[in-house]
Swiss-Prot record:
Its EC number is 2.6.1.83. It catalyses: (2S,6S)-2,6-diaminopimelate + 2-oxoglutarate = (S)-2,3,4,5-tetrahydrodipicolinate + L-glutamate + H2O + H(+). Involved in the synthesis of meso-diaminopimelate (m-DAP or DL-DAP), required for both lysine and peptidoglycan biosynthesis. Catalyzes the direct conversion of tetrahydrodipicolinate to LL-diaminopimelate. SUPFAM superfamilies: PLP-dependent transferases. Its cofactor is pyridoxal 5'-phosphate. The lineage of its organism: Bacteria, Bacillati, Cyanobacteriota, Cyanophyceae, Oscillatoriophycideae. Disulfide bonds: none annotated. This is LL-diaminopimelate aminotransferase. It comes from the Bacteria. Pyridoxal 5'-phosphate binds at residues 72, 108-109, 132, 187, 218, 246-248, 257, 292.
Length: 411
């Protein structure tokens, strides 16, 4: 008889967002007239920028003409897109990243999980707590953890707690770890990292032969000029870090699917025989074997992000969502909530009122205001007692949601 990957049986009952959807759907079935406002999953609501739409329409026409038709493209992405990414996202900020070190993909979520394919099973892995659940669950699936303890933590992972006490940025661990997940601006807390803070991590990784997985999916929301957008703005990071980026939140590509991962060619890790192996070669081999590349049409849309019109339109989109975040923060604070994030980030992280658990507050919010957010405990044990609200929605919905919440709750 065929056997399964038993590691999947270690996973908790449901991935966070499907569980939210299940509860919301159950509520809707019982209350079909309720107008639900979803500020939970970080999905965008505003249309694709005109520059991207125009480029994609032209690309569709290209596919209808024999002379410009495109079949399989390079697994790593078309050169014209990779060159623009390298020049405008990295070289313009003083980062020595070459186009050949950029791998275009269909999502940062996919890449942060798939990157584990090129690493061994005996690495000691560190994640913050709370944390984006994909980092943990993909390690469970890959067999890098044991079972969960009474707190819901997986054996074999090193959890780095983040809270108001440390401004939601983890302390550098005293023990040696091999792989480190960092996300800034942070999902779920909205915290940001200074250059000095990232330099401390780069120094730690260099001293311990560690690799940093740096998720910069929300870097476009940084408005503070003193804050780094890329870990490669830090000296030495090319020797110890892989960076993940996405067009999902800045350009509204959540349903279009395009992202990229940066693997510097000088980055190495150790083989079982002790030799140093270039990770670029392994990732290139992995992508060439398991991935056929992002569609030509979508990549043309992503290329338009870097046009003058595209940059202006994306700036407008980002500003729109940041204004939503500002409204959410101001309204919740006026009602007495303890609020974090929402500046340089599209997520607001709040303390649940009256000592409610994260899921109890979720249910109460849904039942009384018909507003959906994300329970902090779904991001880890240290997220218990917190709640995430997303700024990704229409202005009308955000204002209505805040009106409902502030009328229903006085903290």
């Amino acid at each position: 008889m065929a056997t399964i990957n038993d590691n999947y049986l270690k996973l908790k009952a449901g991935y966070l967002f499907p569980e939210i959807a299940r509860r919301v759907n159950t509520f809707i079935e019982a209350n079909p007239e309720a107008k639900i406002i979803k500020l939970g999953i970080g999905d965008v609501t505003e249309p694709l920028p005109e520059a991207c739409r125009t480029a994609m329409i032209k690309a569709v026409e290209d596919m209808g003409d024999r002379s410009s038709f495109k079949g399989y493209g390079p697994e790593q992405g078309y050169g014209w897109l990779r060159e623009k990414i390298a020049a405008q996202d990295f070289q313009a900020r003083g980062c020595d990243i070459d186009a050949s070190e950029i791998f275009v993909s269909d999502g940062a979520k996919c890449d942060t999980g798939n990157i584990l394919d090129i690493f061994g099973k005996n690495n000691k892995i560190a994640v913050t707590d709370p944390v984006y659940p994909v980092y943990v669950d993909t390690n469970v699936m890959a067999g890098h953890t044991g079972e969960t303890n009474e707190k819901g933590e997986y054996e074999g992972l090193v959890y780095l707690p983040i809270s108001a006490d440390n401004h939601f940025v983890a302390d550098i661990p005293s023990e040696k770890v091999d792989l480190i997940y960092l996300c800034f601006p942070n999902n779920p807390t909205g915290a940001t990292a200074t250059k000095e803070y990232l330099k401390a991590w780069v120094d730690y990784a260099t001293a311990n032969d560690s690799i940093i997985f740096f998720d910069a999916a929300y870097e476009a929301f940084i408005t503070d000029e003193s804050l780094p957008h890329s870990i490669y703005e830090i000296e030495g990071a090319k020797d110890c870090a892989i960076e993940f980026r996405s067009f999902s939140k800045n350009a509204g590509f959540t349903g279009t699917r395009c992202a990229f991962t940066v693997v510097p060619k000088q980055l190495t890790a150790k083989a079982s025989d002790g030799s140093q192996v270039e990770l670029w070669k392994l990732w290139n081999r992995r992508q060439s074997t398991k991935f056929n590349g992002v569609s030509y049409i979508v990549q043309r849309g992503a290329e338009a992000v870097y046009s003058e019109a595209g940059k202006a339109q994306i700036k407008g989109l980002v500003s729109f969502y940041l204004e939503n975040a500002k409204i959410i923060c101001e309204q919740l604070k006026s009602a007495g909530f303890e609020v974090y994030g929402g500046v340089n980030a599209p997520y607001i992280w709040l303390k649940t009122p009256h000592n409610l658990s994260s899921w109890d507050f979720f249910d109460k919010l849904l039942q009384t205001t018909h507003v959906v957010g994300t329970p902090g405990s779904g991001f880890g044990a240290a997220g218990e007692g917190y709640f995430r609200i997303s700024a990704f929605n229409s202005r009308e919905n955000v204002e209505e949601a805040m009106k409902r919440i502030t009328q229903a709750f006085k903290v």
